[in-house]
Amino acid sequence: MGSGYQLLQLPRERFRKTSFLVWVIILFQRAISMPLGIVTNSTLKATEIDQLVCRDKLSSTSQLKSVGLNLEGNGIATDVPSATKRWGFRSGVPPKVVSYEAGEWAENCYNLEIKKSDGSECLPLPPDGVRGFPRCRYVHKVQGTGPCPGDLAFHKNGAFFLYDRLASTVIYRGTTFTEGVVAFLILSEPKKHFWKATPAHEPVNTTDDSTSYYMTLTLSYEMSNFGGKESNTLFKVDNHTYVQLDRPHTPQFLVQLNETLRRNNRLSNSTGRLTWTLDPKIEPDVGEWAFWETKKTFPNNFMEKTCISKFYQPTPTTPQIRARRELSKEKLATTHPPTTPSWFQRIPLQWFQCSLQDGQRKCRPKV
């Protein structure tokens, strides 16, 4: 019994040496890990991912998930006059295209068809396989002319134009896109013992009920001097009725504007063009700038719709003279369109500063 006990017990000196060796191996492995040589079919280098995850967080490319994140959550202005100022033409820069696996709903998308003064196209056709962004609440369809001083239209802030699971640095003609960036999320490796138990298969009822999806609404515009310093944007109600847009506004404002013009018979009644102008005291930011982020709180969120009839102040005109009409000072009623939760949860990302200290790589959030 005693001798058996002695066989299981290491001498104190040998125990110290053995435990010291084990700790050295553990620390050596963590501090000087081999570069991750697992990235093959990717433009990222192994060393870049190695630095990104601080050496010990990524064990397989299956843990990397590329997602497209929209810029709307940053609070940028999404109306057409403001958005087009973020885009510009350049020559001699090759376009870049990268794929992403998942995205999120977009409140505002854009679709451009711009021609030069000589009738030639400003924007290239999309390459094979590039389709429009599939999840848009509002599609702002812009047709017009401009100088287009360059071969391709890029984002001035370096963002991507997100299409259907493809992100490009340039705008393609007649193809719906939204502004965004592509990020790589690192998913933790699942423990193997999670899969030991037989998974329970629950019956799933799938449906193609369209009410569970967003209704996409297309808003049309005419723009002149696209790409120039001073551009002019008109909201198109019908082929002969337009509204001059001279300041930022929400898409909900334009929807109500369109409904009010039609309901109150304010459309052009001849073949001439009728252009309305907004009263300076009208607030064009009714509703929400983006469906997850309310920009402004209004005291009368659910105003009676009967007051909309007073929204316009008719101006006597003759059929021969097409004069601009000015909207009155009444506010539009604020209504909120039905929204659904985003199908991909927005995940806040943070930059980390990594450094090598005492043989170990340490990462801290950037301030």
UniProtKB/Swiss-Prot annotation:
Glycosylation sites: N41, N205, N239, N258, N269
The organism of origin for this protein: Reston ebolavirus (strain Siena/Philippine-92) (REBOV)
This protein's encoding gene: GP
GO molecular function, one term: channel activity
Disulfide topology: C109-C136, C122-C148
Cellular-component GO terms for this entry: extracellular region; host cell membrane
Signal sequence bounds: 1-33
Marked site: Cleavage: R325, E326
Name assigned to this protein: Pre-small/secreted glycoprotein
The keyword Disulfide bond appears for this protein: yes
Protein family: Belongs to the filoviruses glycoprotein family.
